[in-house]
């Protein structure tokens, strides 16, 4: 998936997550910044979820900022998929291609 421009999804409310993405010059790089109110407990799980979604949609060449306020895994995945669709100017997600 090609990221065309910067985008934002989510809020900074409790139990939610705000994710921001922007393309960078190196089309193979991944600049990932995660801050979470529950990072000590769930930091590894948050990072694994983010990387899983990015790998599933074959996203590289981006800066991704994750500001988590205790969001559940399903919320994080939904916010990331929304973010990718917005940044790639997709009208709909390719649901049929999901494993």
Curated annotation (Swiss-Prot):
NCBIfam families referenced in this protein's UniProt entry, alphabetically: citD (TIGR01608), PRK13253.1 (NF009726)
Function noted in UniProt: Covalent carrier of the coenzyme of citrate lyase.
Primary location group: cytoplasm
Modified-residue entries (O-(phosphoribosyl dephospho-coenzyme A)serine), positions: 14
Location within or outside the cell: Cytoplasm
Taxonomic placement: Bacteria, Pseudomonadati, Pseudomonadota, Gammaproteobacteria, Enterobacterales
The entry's keywords: Cytoplasm, Phosphoprotein
Family designation: Belongs to the CitD family.
Transmembrane segments: none
InterPro entries, A to Z: CitD, Mal_deCO2ase/Cit_lyase_ACP
Gene Ontology cellular component annotations, sorted alphabetically: cytoplasm
Protein name: Citrate lyase acyl carrier protein
Subunit structure, interactors included: Oligomer with a subunit composition of (alpha,beta,gamma)6.
Gene: citD
